A protein has these predicted regions:
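Shared catalytic-loop signature of beta/alpha-barrel
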Residues: 1-10, 17-120, 124
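Extended hydrophobic packing segments that form well-structured cores
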Residues: 129-146
């Protein structure tokens, strides 16, 4: 039985929408109107892209967030948020104010950083996430892959 049919209060799944299976169950049980995608909790950008596509196909509203953030996390949030149709995007969370250190800078002055205008954020057009990590802040890598 659908929880949505028992109340007129809109339901958004947040912490429970943490995998492809959870999102599929949410939709199959008609349990909510939307999902809050948390990139680090959901396994990174690739799983979140799949979950985004599943939710968009079902007409669910989406927010893109993370549990806590940094400049690097926010770059991923902003880029994923831009891939959601405006009529389904509830919000993205600017996680940069959650930490007191700066972990990255804009990759290119010409391509810009994250611009805010009329309640929307536009991600950089520079390659990748459009940022240059501050390695002096991050320190040496724990592991590298080639």
């Amino acid at each position: 039985i659908s929880l949505r049919r028992r109340t007129d209060i809109p339901m958004i799944w947040d912490e429970l929408a943490n995998s492809d299976a959870a999102v599929a169950q949410l939709i199959s049980e008609d349990a909510a109107e939307g999902v809050g995608l948390k990139i680090s909790k959901n396994g990174g950008l690739t799983p979140c892209r799949r979950q985004r596509d599943i939710c968009i196909s079902a007409g669910y509203s989406l927010s893109v967030q993370d549990t806590v953030g940094s400049d690097i996390a926010f770059a991923a949030i902003a880029h994923l948020g831009q891939t959601i149709p405006a009529h389904l995007l509830r919000c993205i969370l600017d996680t940069r104010d959650m930490v007191s250190i700066t972990t990255a800078d804009a990759a290119s002055a010409e391509k810009g950083n994250f611009d805010r205008h009329s309640g929307w954020i536009t991600a950089s057009e520079a390659p990748g996430l459009g940022i240059e990590p501050r390695m002096e802040v991050l320190g040496e890598p724990v592991k590298t892959y080639r």
